[in-house]
Curated annotation (Swiss-Prot):
Organism: Prochlorococcus marinus (strain NATL1A)
HAMAP family: CinA_B
Entry similarity comment: Belongs to the CinA family.
Signal sequence segment: none
Protein's name according to its UniProt entry: CinA-like protein
InterPro entries reported in the protein's UniProt record: CinA, CinA-like_C, CinA_C, CinA_KH, Competence-induced_CinA, MoaB/Mog-like_dom_sf, MoaB/Mog_dom
Length: 430
């Protein structure tokens, strides 16, 4: 799998891509527009700069105006929404009208619609057939999960439109299987933009930025930091005449970053913490089990999303109730009564118990107060205790993620913190 992507960018007056999301339900705030964020991430992965995101309601005149404006300033316009059989699905027709191009009915789309119809013997309705109309000369972006296909079309010089349905799962599948490949293969110039993303844990964005001020002012490659819950990303982006040149520019920056930050850097491009933990345990031929309270199985869920995780993950106990901690994990009642469920002695006992129960090399336990209620002056919301028990390792620690965080944030931070400490513990055990 490629760890950096590239695409050529035209050097004429127009530059980059923009995103246009269509639908009155987005404009009115009835649904959250996650498509723009996801497309922006994909453009960054491909190395395509983008400078504008717009939301337009289901209004033909305003939609045509937005499309015309985009065609005069950008090379690529990506739209979501407004594809389908209903009257407010106007995107394809408005695009065709904007560039004075007739719509043509595509037999291949009609066949696909019939195959996807529940009643294959009945005739398609006019509203269903509407989805088979595309601007003359446009390529089809097949919809594998839904009925409305998208288009890939260059209606004028140095301008390409890609359309997608508004359903996120359909958009993502169409992008992965066809659209991203079309963007990469249809080169527009000899200039190449390549990027590589480094992932960091256990360090804040500001502290990381303080360590690399000389890199952040670099022009080619550019270096930028991005903070996410429990993680910081650094994107290195380079321009050149070919991928060999851009990779030569990126490599020394990447090397310097990892030297400065050491083990704080846990992955590159699409690597996740749980994948790194999985690979480390697999290499050592070791196994793990989890005992979770406030995270509700979040650590186990992360690990079991990885194909083949049964080779290293034996199981877990979600011990939310104190009686379960005692009965299934063997935590002594007196320890809970003396120290409280959220304490280092309790998580140590949980880790020992789950390690014995599942006969594994490694065990990790967590107990905390995720809120918004249940906190006290001595044990506030956001306080979480952890333990890692390995073949020759025993670590307990406490984190206070803050009472201003949401329950979901505290759970997510706890899971990521646990996985990162586990990663470091396994590395140190080598």
């Amino acid at each position: 799998m490629k760890t950096s992507k590239e695409i050529t960018i035209n050097k004429k007056n127009k530059f980059g891509a923009e995103i246009l999301c269509i639908g009155s339900e987005i404009l009115l705030g009835n649904i959250v527009n996650t498509n723009s964020q996801w497309i922006a991430e994909q453009l960054a992965i491909l190395g395509i700069p983008h400078f504008r995101q717009t939301v337009i309601g289901d209004n033909p005149a305003r939609l045509e105006e937005a499309i015309l404006e985009a065609s005069n300033r950008s090379e690529i316009l990506i739209t979501t929404g407004g594809l389908g059989p209903t009257p407010d699905d106007i995107t394809t027709k408005v695009i065709a009208d904007t560039f004075k191009t007739p719509l043509e009915q595509r037999n291949d789309i009609l066949i696909d619609l019939r195959n996807k119809s529940k009643d294959k013997d009945s005739k398609l309705s006019d509203s269903q057939k509407k989805q088979s109309l595309v601007p003359k000369g446009a390529k089809i972006i097949n919809n594998y999960s839904g009925t409305a296909p998208g288009i890939y079309w260059s209606p004028k010089e140095n301008f390409t439109i890609l359309t997608f349905p508004g359903v996120p799962s359909e958009l993502k599948e169409m992008w992965a299987k066809e659209a991203s490949k079309l963007l990469i293969s249809n080169n527009l110039s000899k200039e190449v933009i390549s990027s590589k993303v480094l992932h960091f844990a256990g360090i804040s964005e500001s502290l990381l930025a303080d360590k690399i001020p000389h890199l952040l002012i670099s022009k080619n490659p550019t270096v930028a930091t991005y903070a996410r819950t429990g993680e910081v990303k650094v994107r290195i982006t380079a321009k050149g005449e070919n991928s060999e040149e851009t990779n030569r520019l990126i490599e020394p920056i990447k090397k310097e970053l990892t030297q400065i930050t050491g083990l704080k850097c846990f992955g590159i491009d699409n690597e996740t913490l749980e994948e790194i933990v999985f690979k480390l345990l697999l290499k050592r031929k070791e196994t793990i089990a989890v005992a979770e309270s406030c995270t509700g199985g979040g650590i186990g869920s992360k690990l079991t999303k990885i194909p083949g995780s049964s080779k290293i993950f034996h199981g877990g106990v979600i011990a939310y109730n104190n009686s379960i901690k005692q009965r299934l994990l063997g935590v002594p009642e007196e320890i809970i009564n003396t120290h409280g469920a959220v304490s280092k002695p309790v998580v140590e006992s949980m880790a020992r118990g789950v390690q014995i129960k599942f006969k594994v090399n490694w065990a990790i336990s967590v107990s905390g107060i995720a809120g918004p209620t249940g906190g006290s002056k001595s044990k506030p919301v956001g306080l979480v205790n952890f333990c890692i028990k390995g073949p020759k390792t025993l670590i307990t620690w406490e984190e206070n993620f803050g009472s201003n965080k949401t329950r979901e944030d505290i759970q997510k931070l706890s899971v990521l913190n646990a996985l990162d400490r586990l990663r470091l513990s396994i590395i140190m055990a080598n």
